[in-house]
């Protein structure tokens, strides 16, 4: 996956975000994407090759691994980041649409007095108001939903956030109940708890930003003359 391209796109959204939104994006890239790309892959490595069972029965090890780890932690985190980042792309599309409309009006001469040239339209910060407010607020709401949903899926799928050292498996074609050992369980548990904690921080930041936008919206409406 090209994380650099994603950073470029979200960096454009960050320009029009609130201060809390900028903090969220910093946490997303430094504490999640960078950790995932640089450190987590080294810790997990070839998970299936390091998963050892005390049997020589062909296929038993693969079946047991698939039973206890239906989706790799790395792939699940990558999928989570894609879902969490997608709502921000909607904001980027909305901002691009607004700029396109302003360019069209500028070329027609409808708003020539507001801008010197088209380059000024490209660099102007778009205010979060009107229909963009709804798009931006909706994107934050869906980010919270996706974060919470993936945390729940993670907890249910792996039966908690800690990595077991030993798992017992009796799935076919294993001849009986066999013992399987997970490599570096403590290190993996630390990374898992860290990633879950950062997800919780992101949820807190998103909820805080959502409350801030709602309060600002309500206070703005109350100031308008009846």
From Swiss-Prot:
The chain crosses the membrane at residues 21-40, 74-94, 136-156, 190-210. Gene3D superfamilies: Gap junction channel protein cysteine-rich domain (1.20.1440.80). Residues 14-20, 95-135, 211-226 are cytoplasmic. Residues 41-73, 157-189 are extracellular. Ca(2+) binds at residues 42, 45, 47. It holds the Pfam family Connexin. Signal peptide: none annotated. The keyword Transmembrane applies. It comes from the Eukaryota. One of its GO terms (biological process) is sensory perception of sound. It is a multi-pass membrane protein. Structural component of gap junctions. Gap junctions are dodecameric channels that connect the cytoplasm of adjoining cells. They are formed by the docking of two hexameric hemichannels, one from each cell membrane. Small molecules and ions diffuse from one cell to a neighboring cell via the central pore. A hemichannel or connexon is composed of a hexamer of connexins. A functional gap junction is formed by the apposition of two hemichannels. Forms heteromeric channels with GJB4. Interacts with CNST. This is Gap junction beta-2 protein. It comes from Pongo pygmaeus.
């Amino acid at each position: 996956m090209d994380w650099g391209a994603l950073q470029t796109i979200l960096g454009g959204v960050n320009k029009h975000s609130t201060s809390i939104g900028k903090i969220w994006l910093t946490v997303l890239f430094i504490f999640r994407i960078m950790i995932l790309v640089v450190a987590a892959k080294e810790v997990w490595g070839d998970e299936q090759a390091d998963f050892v069972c005390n049997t020589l029965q062909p296929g038993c090890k693969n079946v047991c691994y698939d039973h206890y780890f239906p989706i790799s932690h790395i792939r699940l985190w990558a999928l989570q980041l894609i879902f969490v980042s997608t709502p921000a792309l909607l904001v980027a599309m909305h901002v691009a649409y607004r700029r396109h409309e302003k360019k069209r009006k500028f070329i027609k001469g409808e708003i020539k007095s507001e801008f010197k040239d088209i380059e000024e339209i490209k660099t102007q910060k778009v205010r979060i108001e009107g229909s963009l407010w709804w798009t931006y607020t909706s994107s934050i709401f869906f980010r919270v939903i996706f974060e919470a949903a993936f945390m729940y899926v993670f907890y249910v799928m792996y039966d908690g956030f800690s990595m077991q050292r030993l798992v017992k498996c009796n799935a076919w074609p294993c001849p009986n109940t066999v013992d399987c050992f997970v490599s570096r369980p403590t290190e993996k548990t630390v990374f898992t708890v860290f990633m879950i904690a950062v997800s919780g921080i992101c949820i807190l930041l998103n909820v805080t930003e959502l409350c801030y936008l709602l309060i600002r919206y309500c206070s703005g409406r109350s100031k308008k003359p009846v």
